[in-house]
Regions:
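Flexible interdomain linker/hinge and immediately adjacent N-terminus
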Residues: 4, 85, 89, 93, ...
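Conserved tyrosine-mediated DNA breakage-rejoining catalytic core shared by Y-recombinases
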Residues: 132, 165-203
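N-terminal DNA-binding module of tyrosine recombinases/phage integrases
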Residues: 1-39
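C-terminal catalytic core of Y-nucleophile DNA break-rejoin enzymes
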Residues: 186-232
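Alpha-helix N-cap/helix-start motif at helix boundaries, enriched for small hydrophobics
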Residues: 46, 161-166, 277
């Protein structure tokens, strides 16, 4: 009988991650059941995680320090586990973005089935450049030809994945007001009902545009979705915000006001309005909206 060949590290990575395939499952329902950590819910996430786990495999296979520590080139994923911190430090040293490093840590945590205790860089809001001003890619999206799409995004705040899957059946009218029901392509599979915001004319245009969508919508790669979501967040916040002067001096002041820190130190928001904007966007954290969406309010 011939010797059974041991799978390569890349084959082990592929097999392990494929065993977690949960395409079509509801992450929202799994989260409520406490089992969301067992699955990978989208093809794009699977592809991204496998790609970056392979970068880790390349690192350990090519590292003289790893070979010296083991006495041989690593053969199994378990042998590689100890060198995850060294890989993360190496990636940070290469100057990779905080987002990329954290994503690689998440990919490796999924591969090994545990939350890794790693020292990761913190996101600095001031370093974020994307969607914070005019970019070359914006020139590829005609404002004239896409005026209805742009108006819709400003009025409704969909994510790119949500916009691709919206259809006419997602329009809701409650007490005379238009809403969008987001149930497909949402982050974590969590559904939400978001008000359509804008002037009466803009709202009607957005509602009509939604009726033209089919659930299989092409979204231009150059569309700056985050910036449009920021405009939507500002609209929701402004509608819900109370006068800060009316909240000061009360016993509820600390609970009613959100005071920013870091580079936005001193800026104060109405906490209740922040939560309204956060939920309309599909988040549930006031700090996310204050730090990453209301920059147009500064």
């Amino acid at each position: 009988m011939g010797h059974k060949r041991m799978k390569s590290l890349n084959e082990q990575i592929h097999q392990t991650l494929q065993g977690m395939e949960g395409f079509g499952r509801s992450k929202y329902e799994d989260k409520k059941a406490g089992i969301q950590g067992r699955y990978i819910y989208s093809y794009s996430t699977m592809r991204t995680y496998e790609k970056h786990c392979r970068y880790f495999a390349d690192f350990v296979k090519g590292s003289p320090a790893v070979r010296a520590a083991l006495g041989h080139r690593p053969r199994t994923l378990e042998e590689c586990r100890l060198f995850i911190p060294a890989f993360i430090r190496y990636q940070i040293g290469r100057g990779l973005s905080t987002y990329t490093v954290k994503m690689e840590a998440s990919a490796l945590g999924k591969l090994y089935g545990e939350k890794l205790n790693l020292e990761l860089p913190r996101n600095a809001r001031t370093e974020i450049k994307r969607s914070r001003g005019a970019a070359v890619r914006d020139r590829n999206v005609s404002r004239k030809n896409n005026s209805e799409l742009l108006n819709f995004c400003r009025c409704c705040g969909p994510r790119r994945s949500e916009l691709e899957k919206l259809s006419a059946k997602d329009l809701r009218v409650i007490n005379g007001r238009f809403y969008v029901s987001f149930t497909r392509g949402t982050k974590g599979g969590k559904p939400r009902l978001s008000p359509i915001m804008g002037t009466p004319g803009e709202v009607l245009r957005a509602a009509r545009y939604l009726k033209t969508l089919t659930g299989k919508n092409h979204v231009h790669s150059g569309l700056d979705v985050h910036s449009l979501r920021a405009e939507y967040a500002s609209r929701v916040y402004r509608e819900s915000a109370r006068s800060l002067e009316s909240l000061k001096g009360r016993r509820i002041c600390k609970q009613a006001l959100y005071v920013c820190r870091g580079d936005k130190a001193g800026i104060v928001y109405d906490r209740e309005a922040l939560l309204a904007a956060s939920r309309a966007l599909g988040h549930n954290r006031e700090d996310v909206v204050a730090g990453h969406y209301l920059y147009k309010e500064e």
